[in-house]
Amino acid sequence: SDLASHSWSGDVVSTWEVMRKQLAAGLNYSLCGIPYWNTDLGGFFAWKYNNNVNNIAYHELHVRWYQWGVFQPIMRSHNSSPVAVEIYQFGQKGDWAYDALEKYTHLRYRLLPYLYSTSWEVTSKAGSFIRPLMMDFPKDPKVLDMDTEYMFGHNFLVRPVTDSLYTWQDKNQNGYLKDLKKIGNTEVYLPKGANWTDFWTGQTLEGGQTIQREVPIDIMPIYVRAGSILPWGPAVQYSTEKKWDNLTIRIYPGADAEFTLYEDEFDNYNYEKGAYTTILMKWDDKERTLTINERKGNYKGMLKNRKFNIILVEPGKGCGDKEDRK
């Protein structure tokens, strides 16, 4: 049942090749009608790294796998002893692995309104989080068997980095760091039929082309479909720390868009009895207007007052994980 089941890819080995195969597995699960799926972030068995969490080559693999985890339905690190993957195992503030993990942890929390609303679509309309590109771009022959990137919901194009760029290992599996200032690239295909805004920079590119995206260790290629409405939540340490009474709404222009913001009591099954609300938002690209419709429904403790901060995304404005400014 898409209402109750959650599957994961099993206790997989920590290697780049295995990580790449998990991506294809997740796409296949989605096509089989199983929307809630994840993989053990960083892999489960770190045999190829001498089971040593201090192995610098393992740090790179774990960071890249963790970045991808932000755009999985369930984000879950799970590893075999003696490897522990708490963030403090990867250094401290100022260390490249620690900082990258912290950055993407915060990003996951900021995306909660988007995630929760997408989960409602999964429940109410038999939707899916992970969407092979053929689902949204069936007329583009280049995406029919593409297993390196996917749509997350209807708005995000996600291209995980699945190659080692900044570390290497000797014959004894010891890890060594390369020069992090020598930035590597990852190939990204932008599907034909839409334009795409770089989540990190705000630059918009035309679809139907392959690009080389620079990928510093703290950047995974993420693009937002032009004509998207993205609710952006508060910075929190746990999911219910702050109410959603002051959300930012990022508008990615270039086409008409709509998004339904879903809310409920967050911690029970009362939504099955109708205890939830929805707010439909529509963007008219020609008129450059955003319409926020009246809230429908009700539930105990729902907000009586709220503020939406509207941001029209452009280079340097409404980009990445930074605080939005009007």
What are these regions (language model features)?
Residues 1-219, 224-225:
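Catalytic-domain carbohydrate-binding cleft regions of carbohydrate-active enzymes
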Residues 208, 325-326:
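Solvent-exposed, conformationally flexible loop/turn segments
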Residues 219-325:
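Accessory, solvent-exposed terminal regions and/or long lumenal/extracellular loops of proteins
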